[in-house]
């Protein structure tokens, strides 16, 4: 049986590199996002331009195996009390998950009314550990789809006056940030947010595909991320301005992003959506995924 020790996250570059490698390797070898995607971790670290090192230190916790290698970590995406507490583990260290949950229960006792953890519907091992500790399955929260990007796709025709571009060509980042702010109703998405995000190690503005309106404004986006070690990718975010929806703009942007990822050696790309009945699921099914996994939220009062 493996033995583990837990450690505070110190916000060091070396720790971040270990966390990134664990995610890229576990997801890349299986071809499915068992853990967070590498791009989600990069966004967590770099897009939160106003988050202090002290705040970051309180959002993750590490576990190491008997030889000091990173076995897994817990992480939360936001500082909100109701945000999910995620378990990220190496496949050969799944037995650490009980210790992780025990630590989370101690850490947040009296601070949160309940703990929420995500678990894929086909992950019987984690579900068993959660049940044994008194968690209950609450509801589905998201769908994860995989796509074969080695398959060349025909471009999706755009309405008259609209055209494809990317953020290596379109320089008005404030205008781009307004697109996401409006589409997601999130005023945090501004120029400072974008400039932080663009410092991510695997940010490539040529993969940040956008659609420009006849007036030259960005109105849709499919942002591709690619890591070259395992040739895995993610498209995140995907959105369209409310005034320009139902024109197949997002489908055109995603298709272009797929083809650009393929040209750079991408093998598989993942897109995450809200759970049903989120309307985005219809678009993502039309794109013919090769795999679909649903994540559920589990909860326990503490």
Give residue spans per PLM region.
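Short amphipathic alpha-helix that is part of the acyltransferase structural core
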Residues: 1-45, 156-189
């Amino acid at each position: 049986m493996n033995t583990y020790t837990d450690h505070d996250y110190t916000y060091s570059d070396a720790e971040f590199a270990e966390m990134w490698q664990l995610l890229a390797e576990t997801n890349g070898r299986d071809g499915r996002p068992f853990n967070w995607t590498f791009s989600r971790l990069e966004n967590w670290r770099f897009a939160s331009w106003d988050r202090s090192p002290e705040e970051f230190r309180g959002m993750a916790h590490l576990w190491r195996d008997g030889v000091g290698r990173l076995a897994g970590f817990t992480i939360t995406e936001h500082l909100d009390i109701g945000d999910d507490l995620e378990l990220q583990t190496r496949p050969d260290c799944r037995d650490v998950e009980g210790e992780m949950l025990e630590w989370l229960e101690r850490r947040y006792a009296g601070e949160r009314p309940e703990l929420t953890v995500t678990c894929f519907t086909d992950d019987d091992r984690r579900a068993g550990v959660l049940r044994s500790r008194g968690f209950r399955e609450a509801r589905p929260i998201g769908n994860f789809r995989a796509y074969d990007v080695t398959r060349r796709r025909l471009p999706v025709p755009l309405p008259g006056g609209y055209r494809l571009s990317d953020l290596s060509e379109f320089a008005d980042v404030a205008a781009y940030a307004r697109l996401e702010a409006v589409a997601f109703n999130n005023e945090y998405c501004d120029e400072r947010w974008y400039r932080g995000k663009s410092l991510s190690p695997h940010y490539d503005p040529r993969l940040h595909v956008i659609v420009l309106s006849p007036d030259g404004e960005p109105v849709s986006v499919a942002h591709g991320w690619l890591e070259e070690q395992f040739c895995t990718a993610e498209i995140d975010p995907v959105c369209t301005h409310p005034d320009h929806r139902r024109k197949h703009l997002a489908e055109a942007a995603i298709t272009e992003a797929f083809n650009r990822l393929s040209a750079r050696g991408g093998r598989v790309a993942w897109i995450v959506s809200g759970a049903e009945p989120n309307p985005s699921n219809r678009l993502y099914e039309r794109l013919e995924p090769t795999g679909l996994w649903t994540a559920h939220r589990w909860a326990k009062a503490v």
